[in-house]
Amino acid sequence: MFRWGIIFLIIALIAAALGFGGLAGTAAWAAKVVFVVGIILFLISLFTGRKRL
């Protein structure tokens, strides 16, 4: 998850340097979404823990 966030962040930075505002905004938004989803999944797994059967 975090890997995808970093990839989208790099794409946004490159697009911003080249002046593609729409593409940079979209990639930055996607990076934020992936990051937030990753944090939420991490917190859920942290609180629920591994269940032993």
Swiss-Prot record:
It is found in: Cell membrane. One of its GO terms (cellular component) is plasma membrane. Keywords: Cell membrane, Membrane, Transmembrane, Transmembrane helix. It comes from the Bacteria. It is a multi-pass membrane protein. Pfam families: DUF1328 (PF07043). The chain crosses the membrane at residues 4-24, 27-47. Belongs to the UPF0391 family. This is UPF0391 membrane protein YpsIP31758_3502.
